[in-house]
Swiss-Prot record:
One of its GO terms (biological process) is root hair cell development. Its main location: nucleus. The gene is GIR2. The lineage of its organism: Eukaryota, Viridiplantae, Streptophyta, Embryophyta, Tracheophyta. Residues 1-56 are annotated as: Disordered. Acts as a negative regulator of root hair development redundantly with GIR1. GIR1 and GIR2 may function as adapter proteins that associate with GL2 and participate in the control of root hair formation. GIR1 and GIR2 may function as adapter proteins that associate with TPL and participate in the repression of root gene expression. Residues 31-49 have a biased composition (Low complexity). This is Protein GL2-INTERACTING REPRESSOR 2. Interacts with GL2. Interacts with TPL. Keywords: Nucleus, Repressor, Transcription, Transcription regulation.
Length: 117
């Protein structure tokens, strides 16, 4: 049985990012006499600095939800699937768990003996 449905809807994943501004456009913004030195309260720059002062930096984890079959990046403080709210998540990028699993697998491979050895 094929997993692809040829008549089904196509999934289009596209990330549109604007390129960084050139140095010439940045210099014109700095030299503009009409601009004030402070940012407006609704500006994203001013809100970012306010958030940095009020919040501590939290680490993010990349996990997979076995119920929804999707990967999400979540805060390490409260990891819950945003879709189904499940707390059973697979953290497959955790370095310590990966190293321990790899070392255990390597040891079991070394212990196996074949008839020609």
């Amino acid at each position: 049985m094929s997993r692809r449905n040829k008549n089904g809807p196509k999934l289009e994943l596209r990330l549109n990012l604007s390129p960084p501004p050139s140095q010439a456009s940045q210099m014109s913004l700095v030299r503009s006499p009409n601009r004030s030195n402070t940012t407006s309260p609704s500006s994203c720059v001013s809100s970012e600095t306010n958030q940095e002062e009020n919040e501590t930096i939290t680490s993010m984890v990349l996990v997979g939800c076995p119920r929804c079959l999707m990967y999400v990046m979540l805060s390490d403080d409260d990891p819950k699937c945003p879709k189904c709210k499940s707390t059973v998540l697979l953290d497959f990028l955790q370095e310590n768990a990966f190293a321990a699993t790899t070392a255990t697998a390597a040891n079991t491979r070394r212990k196996k003996k074949t008839w020609w050895n």
